[in-house]
Design a protein with these regions (language model features):
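N-terminal Rossmann-like dinucleotide/flavin-binding domain of flavoprotein oxidoreductases
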Residues: 1-65, 145-162
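Conserved beta-strand segments of alpha/beta enzyme cores
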Residues: 31-33, 84, 130, 162-163, ...
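Helix N-cap at the beta1-alpha1 junction of Rossmann-like dinucleotide-binding domains, i.e.
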Residues: 74, 138-140, 198
């Protein structure tokens, strides 16, 4: 829902937060520790080392089963001028973009035509900002069949979005974006949405198997290569049910279901 806060469809920032530490404790009796980081995992002793950044203290927690849900970070390519581009991953990110949008930029360029790129373009146009989407692939929304993606592209064009497909970005300057094709696009606002990179630092330290796509490989029960460590969310690779190939699907819907599956398995329920 983050892009829709930028467009004003979601009016209140609080509506972006489905839960808070207080609400999770009240509803589920969960002990949620914010400003707290797990810095290492000892899979043999079944312990994690925890750093409390507010108190400056470090301590250990033991576990029977461990669930990793470290998420992912935006991919930022080494393009000259890339520091001008804003990414969209957190509430803090969306605040920055909303502030820039409220300053009424005359033009915007969105780098990336995936789900986030298409949604942010939709909302920029909704705010009356002429918007261009640049996508290296020959279509937007790569997971879709070309026939379906072409319908999305047609609708985007009808709504005023300019598309540059099968093209990339070579440089970003103070007011323009130059493409590999040589085209120069006016860009008061630049948003980068070309995907995410799984966060697997702890997993690697714990000796968990990492797949070719960079995620933690899990089975149908969300178990990693260590039977006592589960993983869910944007940092996992799963077997595609249709193709049988490993897939990385950093979307909220699958992450939600994965969390429920892992919880059911650990609780002894038939998931």
């Amino acid at each position: 829902g983050l892009p829709y806060f930028v467009g004003g469809v979601i009016e209140e920032e609080d509506a972006l937060l489905l839960q808070t530490p207080a609400s999770l404790h009240a509803r589920f009796k969960l002990d949620v520790r914010i400003a707290t980081e797990v810095t290492s995992i000892d899979p043999t002793a079944k312990k994690v080392t925890v750093k409390d950044w507010q108190k400056g203290e470090e301590y250990e927690l033991s576990y029977d089963k461990l669930i990793l849900s470290p998420g992912a970070s935006p991919v930022v390519p080494p393009i000259p001028g890339i520091e001008r581009a804003l990414t969209l991953r957190t509430v803090e990110d969306v605040e920055k973009i909303a502030n820039r949008v409220n300053a009424k930029p005359k033009t915007a360029v969105v780098i990336g035509g995936g789900f986030i790129g298409v949604e942010i373009a939709e909302n920029l146009v909704h705010k009356g900002i002429p918007t261009t989407v640049v996508e290296a692939a020959p279509q937007v929304l790569a997971p879709l069949d070309p026939e379906m993606a072409s319908l999305v592209a047609k609708e985007m064009a009808l709504q005023g979005v300019e598309l540059h497909l099968a093209d990339g970005v070579s440089t970003i300057d103070s007011t323009t974006v130059t493409l590999t094709s040589g085209a120069v696009l006016p860009a008061d606002l630049v948003i980068l949405a070309i995907g995410v990179r799984p966060e697997t630092t702890l997993a690697k330290m714990a000796g968990i198997e990492i797949g070719e796509r960079g995620g933690m490989r899990v089975d149908e029960n969300m178990r990693t290569s260590n039977p006592d460590i589960f993983a869910v969310g944007d940092a996992v690779e799963i077997k595609d049910f249709i193709t049988g190939e490993w897939a990385l699907i950093p979307l909220a819907g699958p992450a939600n279901r994965q969390g429920r599956i892992a919880a059911d398995v650990i609780a002894g329920r038939d998931s």
